Amino acid sequence: MSSIKSKTIIEPSENDIEKGEVDFVSSSISNFEEAYEEGPSLKREFKSRHVNMISVAGAIGTGLVIGSGSALLKGGPGSLFIAYLMTGINLYVVLISLGEMAAFSSDDKGFSGFSSRYVDKALGFATGWNYFFKYAIVYPTNLTAVGIVIHYWRPDLNVGIWVAVFLVVILAINLLHVKYFGEVEFWLSAVKILVLVTLIITCIVITSGGTPVHHKIGFHYWRDPGAFAPYLVEGSTGRFLGFWACLVQSCFAYVGSEVVGIAFGEAPNPEKTIRKSSFQSLFRIATFYVIGVFVLGLCVPYDSDILSSNASKGNAAASPFVVAIKLAQIKVMPDVINACLLVFIISSANSDIYIGSRTLYALAKEGYAPKILMLQTKQGIPWVGCLVTSSFGLLAFMNTKSSSATIFGYFSSAVTVFGTINWINILLSYICYHRATIVQQIPTERIPFRSWGQPYIAYASLIFTGLITFFNGYNAFIHGFKYRSFITSYIGIAAYVIMILGWKFTFKAKRVTSSTVDFRK
């Protein structure tokens, strides 16, 4: 689904974008108009508590719990905190923009439906496939991460064994009735919230001196070694690059928060549910992301040898929260956190298939993919889409051999770009939707809710997201040109542009103007 977010670790690459999780993320909602619907619709069997929990914990994944360690190492605690705060504000604008459109016209055609209806059919085509490939790529990396985490306890067993086991288990969960899937995700999300709250409280206790070493830290590490670390070069330029590295990684941690959008398409009473869930997203951002990285920066210095040596590992040792616990000399916790990471990653992989299958369903319903992808079980599960998405999990077996894993690591680094492009699509769709409601003088009573500052904050968010997407590959040009880093940083943008131009030239698609948007219900 939105979210959670993630981004999961495999082989480290030159690309600055972290391969943390991609924990719960997503894509599915759109046109409400019955005239547009062809074939069966997804069943609205998510309960309100399912959607609410997903909106709070959906995108929380290893991008935050593990990936933030690399960002802290590169930028320091000050850069980390500011980056997560800025990206969090930006994400909130994306989510309330999505919420406004979904509350006005919620159904199951996905983000591509919004783009097609309010902007251009070509953009709708590119949006849908961009979003599907994001999850098709990240799913095998999450399966690999499951194997790596279990390898922490059973190093004698090949990672491929666990990849095969969970490939079957996660597919089986996704073929369950949607209400049972919602129940599974509800409890997985509840565990994630409990773990993060525990980690945040633990960091507060550590910085306050309530540990075996009884050392009160406070803001000591913000003064020595400092709040802002130089990255790649020294001086003010290096500190700015450190901040930018944190900004890119924070996008990776946040990407997928739109996950709540897919739940809207299968939720009863969508107008009420969407409004509530959109505002709950602010609570999640403030509590788990911003406060989480703030207390983390109080407990771990960016020049920590333990942080540096563990940054490339894929298990609990790579988590900066574990580094904080080790520095405080608290025993046992690494094993506990490793078990918790397993829950995070399984939830992420679980939602990858859910989101991928619903995205394929939406593409087929819009006419952008074969109609066979709309086939459902009696319980309303798009089983063909589940099988197609799950088949990408076979790529995870590439990671059982180090030579292939390095190549695949570069490929998976492109996930963040696919995610931020989706934010851009949501914002473009919202801006066009907002303009159309004004041009066509849609009565206020027909608009369930409109947030403060629109559409100006949407324009600001669009510029912010565009800059990060375009300059995310900055490190490919420093200290010599790195072609692998360049390719993984910009292949998503190239594919996106090619899909738009290909559809426009093939089908002579014309842009939808504000006066021609169809608002009929």
Swiss-Prot record:
Pfam (any one): AA_permease
**GO-annotated cellular components:** membrane
Q: Where in the cell is it found?
A: Membrane
Under Gene3D superfamilies, the record lists:
Amino acid/polyamine transporter I
Task: Report the record's Gene Ontology biological process terms.
Answer: amino acid transmembrane transport
Q: Which residues cross the membrane?
A: 53-73, 78-98, 158-178, 186-206, 282-302, 336-356, 380-400, 407-427, 487-507
Write the record's keywords in alphabetical order, separated by commas: Amino-acid transport, Membrane, Transmembrane, Transmembrane helix, Transport
Top-level taxon of the source organism: Eukaryota
Its primary localisation, in coarse terms, equals: membrane
Q: Does the keyword Heme apply?
A: no
Under InterPro entries, the record lists:
AA-permease/SLC12A_dom, Amino_acid_permease_CS, APC_YAT
Any one Gene Ontology molecular-function term assigned to this protein's record: amino acid transmembrane transporter activity
Give the record's membrane topology: Multi-pass membrane protein
The Swiss-Prot or TrEMBL record describes its family as follows: Belongs to the amino acid-polyamine-organocation (APC) superfamily.
Q: What is this protein called?
A: Uncharacterized amino-acid permease C777.04
List the source organism: Schizosaccharomyces pombe (strain 972 / ATCC 24843) (Fission yeast)
